[in-house]
A protein has these predicted regions:
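Bacterial N-terminal signal peptides
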Residues: 8-19
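Extended soluble regions of mature proteins
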Residues: 24-262
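Residue-level detector of alpha-helical transmembrane segments in integral membrane proteins
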Residues: 1, 13-14, 243
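Positively charged n-region of N-terminal signal peptides that target proteins for export
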Residues: 1-8
């Protein structure tokens, strides 16, 4: 089942967004992402201690922003062209997840009565779209590479023996990061974990060799879900202060009901 609008484009934002806040100033991170055979998009991520802003384009081509408040556990999806926004709490995410899980159970029950060939086609069509708990990715270091200005350690990631991911990482000090910079990224991943478990662990984060099988900060991430591959590369990182308005909905924007098309 596809994630319903306006949340379909949020999936990509979550994968890009979980980036580190600064200890003494905010952090601006610029990444470029290509999904499938689509055009390359540039994403700007602005972070402070408990706040995150992700700028991107919606599928309709409008200018969109995701605003995450880690303290209040609220995400706001802003459409700047339409001057509208929707607001989503953790309770909203859990309720939506429960509804999706119910639909998934009904579909799986219906599939039991399909002819084998039809059931196989439906299972393939549904692959990667359901919100089932994913198998943990196991990473293996396979060498080194160069991404932009950085020489990085390359890892291949596997689920059930199948390669589904590639990472290229650098020591966080190379980018000026400390472990505390990644706390808000953990909050974002947990916020959406039940709704989008296949993306919750695919965020920009600090690797821990013991827990995750890789070390360092990914400057390149490649993930495959079903037949779709998403490639994200870090292009720029700077520390700078942000005004409070960076993480707020612009004045005069109209709130829409949750689930309305942005």
């Amino acid at each position: 089942m596809r994630v319903p609008p306006p949340f379909a484009w949020l999936v990509a934002a979550v994968c890009v967004a979980a980036s580190p806040p600064g200890a003494s100033a905010g952090v601006l991170i610029v990444e470029k992402t290509t999904t499938g055979g689509g055009p390359t998009q540039t994403h700007q991520v602005m972070i402070e201690k408990d706040s995150m802003r992700v700028e991107h384009d919606t599928p309709s081509g409008d200018k969109g922003t995701v605003l995450f408040d880690g303290t209040k556990q609220v995400t706001r999806l802003v459409n700047h062209d339409k001057k509208t926004y929707t607001e989503m709490t953790k309770a909203d995410v859990d309720a939506m997840s429960q509804r999706m899980e119910g639909v998934m159970a009904q579909m799986q029950e219906h599939m039991k009565h399909m002819p084998p060939e039809q059931r196989a086609r439906m299972e393939e069509k549904m692959k990667g779209r359901m919100a089932a708990a994913p198998v943990k990715i196991t990473y293996r270091k396979v060498g080194s590479d160069t991404v932009g200005a950085w020489t990085c350690d390359r890892y291949d990631g596997y689920q059930d023996g199948q390669k589904v991911a590639e990472l290229c990482t650098v020591d966080p000090t190379v980018l000026g990061f400390v472990p505390e910079d990644f706390e808000v990224s953990k909050k974002l991943g947990e916020f959406f974990r039940r709704l989008m478990p296949q993306n919750a662990d695919n965020v920009f984060r600090l690797g821990n060799a013991e827990d995750q099988g890789f070390s360092g900060v990914p400057v390149k991430r490649v993930f495959t879900v079903g037949q779709r591959q998403t490639v994200t590369e870090l292009t720029r990182v700077t520390r700078e202060p942000f005004p409070a308005s960076t993480f707020a909905v612009p004045e005069g924007f109209q709130r829409q009901a949750l689930g309305a098309r942005q």
